[in-house]
């Protein structure tokens, strides 16, 4: 992402992506989330949508569906 964007624009771009629309997985840099919308607002929106999210190595991994997550290893 380039330049400052509003929280509404951030979420619009995130949830209008092909992966998000098809119920797949998307990633966002933690620093971008914190810069554009704030961690708390981001997590509240994902919780509202029922989308699981995990954090690893400076990335948020968002499962754009409400299916259970099973760690296999």
Predicted stretch roles:
Residues 40-72:
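Short, compact, well-ordered microdomains
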